Amino acid sequence: MSDLEQLERQILEDIAAAVDEQGIEAVRVAALGKKGTVSEKLKTLGGMSPEERQMQGPAINGLKNRVTEALSERRTELRKAAVAARLEREKVDVTLPVRESAASRGRIHPISQVIDEITAIFADMGFSIAEGPDIETDYYNFTALNFPEGHPAREMHDTFFFNPDEKGERKLLRTHTSPVQVHTMEKFAAMRDKEGRDEPIRIVIPGKTYRMDSDATHSPMFHQVEGLVVDKSANVVNMKWVLEEFCKAFFEVPSVKMRMRPSFFPFTEPSVEVDIQCDRSGPHVKFGEGNDWLEILGCGMVHPNVLRMSGYDPEVYQGFAWGMGIDRIAMLKYGMPDLRAFFDADVRWIEHYGFRPLDIPTLFGGLSA
């Protein structure tokens, strides 16, 4: 066996014996490094005669190429083995039950839970979710909703205003989610006019709203959900059916009596407030039974002025809308006495009233089962 054959055999044995990338790198340096055994052989070619170089050159270069290829193959094998070992170490048996300690580390906030419940119910009735900015213009928050400048109903909204900008326009924190109704109607009206797609509107709008209130039942920031339907045939009967189905599903009762009382909202005409049947004789309110009534939401047919300003002819289209405080109905359903506790970030309160993240109720299985 020649010296080159012996050297190649030794190097290949060292490569096969390497158990990690550090070992492979050590073999590479020993063989192909600046002072490596194969590199030293290559250096000898410079001192050979042309005849010797012609004989030895191909053999030494062939050795270098075979060693390089063997190093590459072994490095690839080791990398694959390392990945497989890591996957084996980190393998998770997804059929195992969740440990109680892991499941109890966090809770779904009641507000998030109730928003999910509300949107699930309306989604089952064919509604889509719409959203809009918290910072609004005076036009979208008031004027487009039939609150003209100087209208006394503006005083009912204790509004947070920003300082005027360089154009003199003063923006505000929206006092209700109703501006999203106007944005949506404008969008659908533009789509109708440009593309000829005259589609009905069926949306629910959950979100934050802001007013300067703070007591046990009011907060400067609170959550509201509104709904809007606009179509050529929308009517009060449709509205009553939608709201009755919602109340039955949300409060999980087979039937519920509703009472509508005349009211006033600038953006609807006629406007009504809805009370639902309940029993308040015990420590918790029971819905769908008893002789008591509890106000739950406000609603009405969209005012012709609002339709007109949003791009709809009130002689052709009709709509109905409703709105309710998410925080308030969460308090009613789950027996929470103080609205301010929703925003105190008290871990004990969350542990008591929150929902398990891996046991989230569904509409199909019962909202609060």
UniProtKB/Swiss-Prot annotation:
The source's domain of life comes to Bacteria
Instruction: List ligand-binding residues for Mg(2+).
Output: E269
Q: What is its EC number?
A: 6.1.1.20
Q: Name one Pfam family in it.
A: tRNA-synt_2d
Q: Name one GO cellular component term.
A: cytoplasm
Q: What class of enzyme is it?
A: ligase
Q: What GO annotations for molecular function exist for this entry? A: ATP binding; magnesium ion binding; phenylalanine-tRNA ligase activity; tRNA binding
> Is Nucleotidyltransferase among the key words of this record?
no
Q: Which family does it belong to?
A: Belongs to the class-II aminoacyl-tRNA synthetase family. Phe-tRNA synthetase alpha subunit type 1 subfamily.
Q: How does it assemble?
A: Tetramer of two alpha and two beta subunits.
Write down what this protein is called. Answer: Phenylalanine--tRNA ligase alpha subunit
